[in-house]
From Swiss-Prot:
This is Small ribosomal subunit protein uS9. Coiled coil: none annotated. It comes from the Bacteria. InterPro entries: Ribosomal_Su5_D2-typ_SF, Ribosomal_uS9, Ribosomal_uS9_bac/plastid, Ribosomal_uS9_CS, Ribsml_uS5_D2-typ_fold_subgr. It comes from Borrelia garinii subsp. bavariensis (strain ATCC BAA-2496 / DSM 23469 / PBi). The gene is rpsI.
Amino acid sequence: MKKSNFSNVNLSMGTGRRKSSVARVYIREGSGNIRVNNRDFDSYIQLENLRTMALSPLVLTNTLGKYDLYINVYGGGISGQSGAIRHGISRALFELDESNKMILRSNGFLTRDSRRVERKKFGQKKARKSFQFSKR
């Protein structure tokens, strides 16, 4: 997370992670354009609940139309990617304005969600599910 001066505009960067997804979020002042992997945000994340979850740090800090976001995200599925975007947006907002720290921290947006897929065990069908038991 570093702050740099890019073409006379204040640019802030945040890296977010969730499951196996990594998102690099670049924020600068603008009109509210959001681009994910050079695509429009609404066409990249098509499920409404995932869009709402990814943009919740902006809604919480009342900065939804004030910044342009450029996001590079890779790895994992769409749910993990939207969680990584949320984490990256939160970190970039904190880097841009440190007064957002208490709001973001109290809602858990600055904390990385460390839940991962549990591995499959041998002698079982899945991670927790066992094979069907036959008494006779």
